[in-house]
Regions:
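Bacterial N-terminal signal peptides
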Residues: 5-14
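Gly/Pro-enriched, hydrophobic low-complexity segments
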Residues: 107, 130-211
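General beta-strand recognition
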Residues: 46, 76-78, 88-90, 95-97, ...
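N-terminal mature ectodomain segment of secretory-pathway/periplasmic proteins
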Residues: 40-93, 98
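Short, mixed charged/polar active-site loops
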Residues: 60-65, 86-88, 104-106, 163-165, ...
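Acidic/charged, solvent-exposed loop-and-adjacent secondary-structure segments enriched in E/D, K/R, S/T
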Residues: 98-124
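Solvent-exposed coil/turn segments that connect beta secondary-structure elements
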Residues: 50-52, 73-75, 82-85, 94-96, ...
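Boundary at the C-terminal end of the N-terminal hydrophobic targeting segment
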Residues: 18-22
Length: 211
């Protein structure tokens, strides 16, 4: 649950008043602008994902797999784990549904500021739109080994209880997020690899049903 909510893969009006850093390197500014333009143009997106959870106190890695569907219009997201367990998180406007083992909970995000902010940044992290949210993150972007890598650190203290750093890896050609890495204060790390990414495809409305 915690990983699904923080993805993000990402998330914030809050109590802190720390300023965010504004990039001054022209190359960094252009990378952020290019990613934001691409993310803003995405009408819909669907993909498979593999999530690897590394706990600081254990050597074993927990690997799970699932599917994700996103639609920009109406702010809709479907995040579903398929193995080794089943869990579904659906965001549709101001409503969130969480379903596990046949039990379903529905939350109205309009009455829960933190949940609303987390859900919004979760979507923006998956598409890359979070890079321009200067009130939320200290952001650095660089080109490295044929990839674009963005490092985001939350500036508001209530977000740091979920993660201390987010790293997003982008395919420079498509300007799409292909990897999300979440680092927690405890030393735990979650890596999400997005695969078989398809954009601007028709997605059945059933995936966004909240009931």
């Amino acid at each position: 649950m915690k990983t699904a909510v923080t993805i993000l893969f990402l998330l914030l009006a809050g109590l802190g008043n720390l300023p965010a850093q504004t990039p001054h390197d022209p190359a960094e500014v252009e990378l952020i602008a290019a990613i934001d333009r691409s993310a803003s143009a995405i009408r819909s997106l669907q993909c498979d994902f593999t999530q690897t959870k590394e706990l600081s106190l254990l050597q074993d890695k927990m690997v799970s797999r699932g599917v994700m569907y996103y639609r920009q219009e109406g702010g809709k997201l479907h995040w579903e784990y398929l193995s080794p367990y089943t869990y579904t998180f659906v965001l549709n406007g101001d409503r969130v549904m969480m379903r596990s083992s046949g039990h379903t909970d529905v939350v109205e995000t309009s009455g829960n500021r933190m949940f609303r902010q987390i859900a919004r940044i979760m979507m923006h992290s998956l598409t890359g739109r979070c890079l321009t949210q200067e009130a939320e993150f200290d952001t650095q972007v660089r080109a490295e080994d044929g990839r674009w890598i963005a490092t985001l650190k939350p500036v508001r203290r209530e977000m740091r209880q979920f993660f201390t750093e987010v790293r997003l890896c982008f395919d420079p050609g498509r300007k799409l997020v292909t990897r999300v890495e979440l680092l927690e204060e405890s030393g735990d790390r979650t890596v999400i690899e997005l695969k078989n990414i398809r954009t601007d495809v028709d997605i059945d409305e059933k995936y966004f049903a909240v009931d």
